[in-house]
């Protein structure tokens, strides 16, 4: 089976959206944030929602950004498709719907809200994906960054759309993004400086159809990284261990089961960082407020990302000692 992402083969990092007509698919939180960003940038958008019985008045009351916009419900007619230059797809909309396939066949570029935000955002980016542990790790990395940098934004699948903050970023902004497999399906140029894939276990196969496609989607978070960028991977995940050997980026592994010559590892109750020459103790797990092997793995991933991003170890440890568990969503 051929895995299909949402964006097809279309690629143009310098696309000028001025004068373009953008179709926003989905009227929920993600769609509203995308529409708000487009409106801020003076770009015309059309809203589409597959619910033909959607209460438009209630929708506009909840999301005034849709007031005055053209709103299409139920089905998208061919004449409507002909007027569209770009599609922004909400993460909850499957990329293999007949309508999406038809838009793709018409060579209309299809982005997700992450890609749209990246098009306008400035600054440096850290992105985190994985089947489990994303929210805890993203929150921890966000707090570490805020302990060292002045302008930090934590966005993505954690609950804050990237599009809602993209217009407020500067070259000094550090953005920490939790990225789901659904969001990765519709990224094309998104290029984080540091990425992490925490683990990969069977999930969302009703959407991705096969484990191979799910893995491919998760691994695509690295596709635009360069040799100077870094990917942090779980050494104890066999898929990710093999994947690390194929990357042209810097790779930092972490392990909860064995000592690593380079990377982060758990030895008894101590977490160490090994640079190939020296093994440095980072913290004893009893000094943490989050317990369990899965959380120690999240901590090691966060430390690996933060060190790769240039944060001093002492600034990292300060946050590790005070970080509290994230409320389960």
Q: Model-flagged regions — what are they?
A:
Residues 10, 37-40, 78-82, 91-235, ...:
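Phosphate-binding loop of NTP-binding sites
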Residues 3-112, 116, 291, 301, ...:
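N-terminal leader/targeting and accessory segments in enzymes
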Residues 75, 114, 156, 254-257, ...:
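Residues at the C-termini of beta-strands that transition into short coil/loop
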Residues 28, 51, 158, 236-237, ...:
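Residues in the short beta-alpha loop(s) of Rossmann-like NAD(P)-binding domains
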